[in-house]
Amino acid sequence: MQLDNQNLIWIDLEMTGLDPENERIIEIATIVTDKDLNILAEGPVLAVHQSDELLAKMSDWCIKTHSANGLVDRVKASKLTERAAELQTIDFLKKWVPKGASPICGNSVAQDKRFLFKYMPELADYFHYRHLDVSTLKELARRWKPELLNGFEKKNTHLALDDIRESIAELAYYRDHFIKLDGDQK
């Protein structure tokens, strides 16, 4: 384990919906990579307890998806609060990345950050203010090189750790096929 300013913190949240004013976090996971996207460590994968009433108010899509992947059962069985999950995550990150060094990394991370600001503000503050959002490259590829979109396929399990692994792999794909760091810009 080595604390390094260049390490990247990857995060994904699963929520009961998309509106942080009315919805809550039900799962959080993190992975730390080096600057070259090699996985150094996987953080705790934490199901956050939420009330049956809140879970029952989820959209049909959320109920179907989070029931099929087992997350609803894990949330109901969990005793973990959002605050406890936040502190466990920060304790893990402190071993790998200094506070304020890493941008928040993942897919559509602005959405995750909205929930972090609302429910896990200390964790939100752990990140640099910049974002490393893989979905930006996806949107650019869609417009400038749409043929690249067929080269990477996601499983979309909507489990936080799986989603992070896919985000890292997707960024590596775009690095190799879109950004082309080797200087071969055809």
UniProtKB/Swiss-Prot annotation:
Cytoplasm listed as a keyword: yes
Single biological process term from Gene Ontology: DNA metabolic process
Location relative to the cell: Cytoplasm
Alphabetized SUPFAM superfamilies for the sequence: Ribonuclease H-like
InterPro entries: Exonuclease_RNaseT/DNA_pol3, Oligoribonuclease, RNaseH-like_sf, RNaseH_sf
Active site per the UniProt annotation: 129
Exonuclease domain ranges (all copies): 8-171
Annotated Gene Ontology cellular component terms: cytoplasm
Keywords tagged on the record: Cytoplasm, Exonuclease, Hydrolase, Nuclease
EC numbers on record: 3.1.15.-
Any Pfam family matching the protein: RNase_T
SMART domains (UniProt xref): EXOIII
Primary role: 3'-to-5' exoribonuclease specific for small oligoribonucleotides.
Matching PANTHER family: OLIGORIBONUCLEASE, MITOCHONDRIAL
Name of this protein: Oligoribonuclease
